[in-house]
């Protein structure tokens, strides 16, 4: 699908824009902690909520909000045609899962570290890697692990197949997610404190190494991606 784009403008008004570069979005107007990232080519909505040198925005593909520095305004371009979500059947998604897995394995081969809020390579957080992997084939997932858990079709651990998502956390909430590879293994981006400070492969077993065992003790369940996310803010 093609979009008609207007020329660059330094101070965009409220409306929909396309990112011309990879951009950082922050979780507060102070812009001290990364919330997420927007890869070049993504669409975002600039709201009327301006505070000093930042503006609140939300990403059109996943409805995720954050704060954007006005210094990044020159990396936005107005879109005259709104973002339109693609639709996929379950069978179409199934055929694309080998490419989703290949994306994560290629990402693991690059020098990387765990980055909270990271969705743009080479550095990702857990759910950012999952979102980027599926987005690489045009399928959009919600941004955070708990949102991805709620979005997928619940399955049992015994039903796991390559390309399914595996969720970890507490009894109250999913705080971590990985992509199942088959034969008990999954790939994920994990942090320094509990994980590998980057992308690695672990096993769903009490017999694995310390990292695998730690996550296995927090295993919540699994989910199957059966559709692409459709924006709710329109």
What kind of feature is each model-predicted range?
Residues 1-14, 32, 45, 58-107, ...:
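Boundary regions of SH3-family modules and the immediately adjacent low-complexity/disordered segments
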Residues 51-56:
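Short aromatic-glycine-enriched beta-strand elements
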Residues 140-207:
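...with weaker cross-activation on analogous glycine-rich loops/strands in unrelated enzymes
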Residues 112-162:
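Catalytic cysteine-centered active-site loop
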Residues 4, 14-27, 181-234:
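Aromatic- and glycine-rich peptidoglycan recognition patches
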Residues 19-29, 143-150:
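Short, structured beta-strand/loop micro-motifs enriched in basic residues and often containing a Trp
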Residues 27-40:
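SH3/SH3-like (including bacterial SH3b) beta-barrel domains
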């Amino acid at each position: 699908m093609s979009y008609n784009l207007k020329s660059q403008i330094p101070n965009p008004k409220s409306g929909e824009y396309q990112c011309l570069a990879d951009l950082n979005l922050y979780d507060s107007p102070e812009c001290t902690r990364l919330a997420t990232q927007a890869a070049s080519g993504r669409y975002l909505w600039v709201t009327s909520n301006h505070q000093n040198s930042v503006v609140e925005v939300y990403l059109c593909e996943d409805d995720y909000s954050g704060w954007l520095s006005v210094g990044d305004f020159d990396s936005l371009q107005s879109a005259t045609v709104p973002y339109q979500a693609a639709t996929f059947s379950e069978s179409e998604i199934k055929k694309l899962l080998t490419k989703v897995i290949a994306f994560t394995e290629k990402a693991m081969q690059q020098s990387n570290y765990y980055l909270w809020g990271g969705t743009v390579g080479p550095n990702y957080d857990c759910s950012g890697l999952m979102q980027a992997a599926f987005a690489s084939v045009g399928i959009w997932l919600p941004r955070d692990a708990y949102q991805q858990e709620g979005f997928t079709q619940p399955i049992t651990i015994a039903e796991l197949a390559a390309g399914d998502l595996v969720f970890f956390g507490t009894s109250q909430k999913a705080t971590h997610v990985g992509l199942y590879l088959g034969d008990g293994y999954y790939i994920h981006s994990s942090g320094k404190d509990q994980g590998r400070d980057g992308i690695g492969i672990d096993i769903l077993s009490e017999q694995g190494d310390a990292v695998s065992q730690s996550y296995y003790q927090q295993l919540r369940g699994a989910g199957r991606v059966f559709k692409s996310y459709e924006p709710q803010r329109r």
